[in-house]
């Protein structure tokens, strides 16, 4: 399953990548993106992945700004420390909403759904 991570915290990327490797070894990490601008640029020249893990607060703004520029058609699992965006997340292809710190069980359950 071709997957990308949109996250600006290196420790969170390492944690999520490690968990995904343990829980779902068939996941193919395509890229890691750390900003709204970088994500928009990447999608302009690459095919849609099969799954996205996306943090909401990125260094250059809210990840929801991405949806104003790109029509994302694959499932999204949001990963954030903030619970107040859950309703908004489910309006943009979200299949799950994981609160940080993310553990193995969180990832297992998100991928089962």
List PLM regions with ranges.
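Conserved acidic carboxylate
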Residues: 7
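Two-component/phosphorelay signaling modules centered on CheY-like receiver
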Residues: 10-34, 69
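Conserved protein kinase catalytic core
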Residues: 13, 40-41, 61
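Non-catalytic signal-transmission and effector/linker regions of two-component phosphorelay proteins
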Residues: 1-2
């Amino acid at each position: 399953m071709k997957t990308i991570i949109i996250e600006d915290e290196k420790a969170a990327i390492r944690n999520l990548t490690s968990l995904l490797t343990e829980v779902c070894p068939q996941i193919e990490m395509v890229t890691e993106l750390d900003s709204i601008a970088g994500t928009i640029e990447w999608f302009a020249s690459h095919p849609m992945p099969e799954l996205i893990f996306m943090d909401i607060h990125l260094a250059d703004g809210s990840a929801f700004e991405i949806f104003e520029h790109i029509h994302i058609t694959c499932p999204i699992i949001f990963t954030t420390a903030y619970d107040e965006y859950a309703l908004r997340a489910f309006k943009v292809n979200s299949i799950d909403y994981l609160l940080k710190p993310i553990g193995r069980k969180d990832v297992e359950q998100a991928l089962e759904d």
